[in-house]
Amino acid sequence: MTFAIFCYLWNGEKIVPADVRGSGYLYIGSVRYSLDSAKPAFESAPFAMGRIGRLGEEYDTRYFLNDHLGSVRTIVNQNGVVTVEYDYMPYGMQHKNSSLATSDANEFRYNGKEFLSRFCVDLYDSQARLQGMNARFNSIDPLAGDTPHVSPYVYCAGNPIFRIDPTGLASETPYHYNWETGQYEDANGHGVVWGTVWYYLKPSAN
């Protein structure tokens, strides 16, 4: 049996995921440190287009290309070469067409969330809860009382193609109307045309 240990601050912020030997990561804000050596060593940190991380004694910059749900679809290295491509089933399972190399160490994938396979659990870290690839969270929604008509375990109200749940507390749509700018924007605040929004809002032909 394999055990994973997760440590959190009082406000629910994760600071350490590790195995029973203490091998894992230390989080200070969004910066991740490796605990695989005698003392914590810088591992990676996010920036606008991806992550910069340590590869041995060198630093490797990787650019993440995301889809409308924030899922990482392609990773490009600092030389502009595509190193890996991801395709997902609706609830985050890796599609067989993905060019996932065995040497690929990236753990930020579906919806941009950290995949915890290193700790022998096929779950995504959704901050407030851990999310499986079977359309369910592994624990009840702390805000379940706000949506009594929805199962407290279901992911994105059963609609993972259109909705996202970045915190594990409440699902939301990837597009919203900004009343100050008078346009629709994606989750990153970038303007999108109405046709893009309508594509995801239009009723199904079935």
Label every model-predicted segment.
Residues 23-25, 35-36, 49-53, 82-83, ...:
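A short local loop/turn or secondary-structure capping micro-motif enriched for an aromatic residue
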Residues 1, 6, 10-24, 29-31, ...:
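Conserved catalytic cores of ATP-dependent inositol ring kinases
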Residues 30-35, 49-54, 172-176:
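Short polybasic amphipathic segments
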Residues 4-13, 24-33, 39-49, 62-70, ...:
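Aromatic-rich beta-strand edge motifs centered on tyrosine
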Residues 24-25, 107, 123, 152:
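A residue-level signal for beta-strand positions that form part of recognition/binding surfaces
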Residues 1, 17, 51-54, 75, ...:
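Beta-strand-dense domains in secreted/periplasmic systems and polymorphic toxin scaffolds
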Residues 80-97, 119-122, 127-205:
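Short turn/helix-capping motifs enriched in Asx and small/polar residues
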Residues 35, 39, 53-127, 161-163:
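A motif-centric feature for acidic-aromatic and gly/ser/thr-rich catalytic loops and repeats
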